[in-house]
Amino acid sequence: METHIRYSRQDRTLILLDQRVLPTVEEDFYCNDVADTIYALQTMVVRGAPAIGVTAAYGCCLAAYEAGHPAPHAQWQKELDTLLEKLAQARPTAVNLRWAVERMRSVWKSMGDPDLNTLIARWLDEAEAIHEEDKSINRAIGRHGATLIQDNDCIMTHCNAGALATAGYGTALGVVRGAVDAGRTGITVIANETRPFLQGARLTAYELHKDGIPVTVACDNACGLLMQRGMVQKVVVGADRIAANGDAANKIGTYSVALLAREHGIPFYVAAPLSTIDRATPSGKQIPIEERPAEEVTHVGETRITPEGVPVYNYAFDVTPAHLIAGIVTEQGVLRPPYTASIARAFAAADKDRS
């Protein structure tokens, strides 16, 4: 499943599989400019930190076309900077969004004073590189994560950190796929439904079912019972931002799952690329938490389920403290506490690999 993010150079169009209507409908959403891309990000046509980063990289290319339309003018650089900042602010929690925009911006600045067409050509190559890198990174995460999984393990996951949330293969689901690819047998998955947007029930179950990996959907509030009954051996989740100390922001409800895992002696792992680790954020206290529209909670489809006038908390993410995390699975291996040190070593190793 690696065709859910596509870019047509000929049509200058970013094509996204619309995740809002999965699993019952498979249809594409077309982004022709920055406004379309921001809409896709904010309404969760595309979601998941790595996938957001890849989308943002292509969105920068659309921004360049837009800044020069109908023809390059004296102010195109200023206009492009404005469009890039709008794109970077589309969703506040997922650090890969700004990471991708800043990577594209740094390529631009390294070119001196390029003309617009030269910049666009270079950016398209860079966006495609980011796209392909993420696929390779996720497979590396899967290989490292597979070492944590034994035959007959039942793995609980929360939200969707699979192929749909990345360029392909997945982070948390990459660990599952990596274990299966490594020959582990009897692997099963419990996908928490993940209210209110139901990424687990709709997307994780969709992916794994397509792959033939046994998956069972569970109500979010059944986690404790399932663990208490010995039905869960590992928990593996993704992340939208990881602080320098190892605190991890992920879909709302993840913190509760981590607490339950600790109570029942079940290892709780986070799987994410190094690009999701924000070393400029000291701890989870500094991670901004997005609030989403109340209608996601007050309505099921078109039907209202809460009384008019009753307020709603609809935080999209929570932060799991580092002390609840047994390991962070990255492309550089499984990081262990203390995370400040192991994160620093992982980045140093990655820098060495690139040099």
Swiss-Prot record:
It comes from the Bacteria. The record marks C159 as: Transition state stabilizer. The keyword Disulfide bond does not apply. Gene3D superfamilies: translation initiation factor eif-2b, domain 1, Translation initiation factor eif-2b, domain 2. GO terms for biological process: L-methionine salvage from methylthioadenosine. Pfam families: IF-2B. The active site is at D240 (proton donor). Substrate binds at R47, G48, A49, R91, Q199, N250, K251. Pathway: Amino-acid biosynthesis; L-methionine biosynthesis via salvage pathway; L-methionine from S-methyl-5-thio-alpha-D-ribose 1-phosphate: step 1/6. One of its GO terms (molecular function) is S-methyl-5-thioribose-1-phosphate isomerase activity. It is an enzyme of class 5 (isomerase). Its EC number is 5.3.1.23. Keywords: Amino-acid biosynthesis, Isomerase, Methionine biosynthesis. It catalyses: 5-(methylsulfanyl)-alpha-D-ribose 1-phosphate = 5-(methylsulfanyl)-D-ribulose 1-phosphate. Belongs to the eIF-2B alpha/beta/delta subunits family. MtnA subfamily. Catalyzes the interconversion of methylthioribose-1-phosphate (MTR-1-P) into methylthioribulose-1-phosphate (MTRu-1-P). This is Methylthioribose-1-phosphate isomerase. It comes from Oleidesulfovibrio alaskensis (strain ATCC BAA-1058 / DSM 17464 / G20) (Desulfovibrio alaskensis).
